Amino acid sequence: MLYYDEIFCSIQGESTDTGLPCVFIRLFECPIGCSYCDQPQKKEDRKRISVGNIVQTVLKEYKWCKNICLTGGEPLIYDEALPLVYELQSLGFKVSIETSGCVPLEEPCYRRSYKYVMDIKGPSSGVKHKNIYENLLKLQNTDEVKYVIKDREDYEFMKGVMKKYPTSAKILVSPMFDPDGKAYIGHELVDWILEDHLDVRVQIQLHKILEVK
């Protein structure tokens, strides 16, 4: 059994799938505690559900949508997370897993057909000590790594990690936004990236700009 918050359909607001219709399976509980978390969860909101019931819900309500994102919370704290992914893939869905980067990934003994979108937490998150950097070495070129940047310290930290732990995964860079929806850093971030010739993708949270779930 898993605990979850909700299952809903919207557009993907982040990653290289930005703008595509997507079914989100939001699992409950995250052991990380980032300072900028935009999905705080209340224990009273959690609900139990089986892998089978999740699959039935997706097939009944969202069969037309072929993109599924397993998110949270932290999906990988559940032993049932990957069996759920395999079941959804067997039905023809394209699945991505959003993970904090603070839970060990499985060993890359074969080429995965699902995608990880993995965070690396910077200094402003307050939890960078929880990063498992070895996860970066387990990623494929179909995976993605996301950094949230508030200031120069976060940016320099990102550069250091990229140099020490080179990965074939795509690198996504997001400016951090304050509670009023204003970016802490804007053109400066772009200037730094261009000056340093970094092969990264700058992204923003499209769903927040469009004011959709």
Range-by-range predicted roles:
Residues 2-7, 11-14, 31, 35, ...:
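Residue-level signal for well-ordered alpha-helical segments
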Residues 11-18, 42, 56-58, 83, ...:
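Short, flexible coil/linker segments at or flanking structured domains
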